[in-house]
Amino acid sequence: MNIAIVDIGSNAIKYKIFDSKFNLVEYYRHPLRLGRDVFSQGYLNKNTIEEVIALLESYLKVFKEKEIAEYYFIATSALRDCKNSGELLSLLEVKNINVQIISGDTEASLLAELNKDINNSAVIDIGGGSVEICINSDNKIH
C-alpha cells in the first residue's frame, strides 16, 4: 500500500508518494508562491486561493487514480502566518481535503527525528518563510 504526503509550502506545493517500505516512488513539485501573498499582504488573494484548491483537487484525483488510500496534506509557514487560512481550509474541507497546519516546533521535531541517529550533526531546513535548525550534539537534540 502506498502513502502520499503533500507539502504546502511558501514557494511550492509538492507531493511525494512512498511504497509500504517508505521508498520514494514519485515526486511532483508545482511552483505556487503562497508566500508572495502572505509575506507581503498577510493574506492569500482570491485567485491564489482558487489556484490552491484546483491544484490540491488535481493531486487528490491522482491519488485516487493510483489507488492511494492514505494521504496527508501538511502546510507550513505561509498558511501558519496567513490571516485568512481558515477561509481556505473551510473551502478545502467541503471538497474532502483536510489540511493540517503544523507549527514551527513540529517542523523542528520532524527534523530532530531525521537527525537523531547521527551524532554531532546538524540539519537545517531553509523554507520560504521560516528556518528550522536541529543539532545533535553528544546524542542530545537541540
Q: What annotation goes with each model-predicted range?
A:
Residues 1-10, 16-123, 134-142:
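Nucleotide/phosphate-binding catalytic cleft detector across ATP-hydrolyzing
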Residues 129, 133:
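Active-site-adjacent helix-turn-beta-strand microarchitecture at beta-sheet edges
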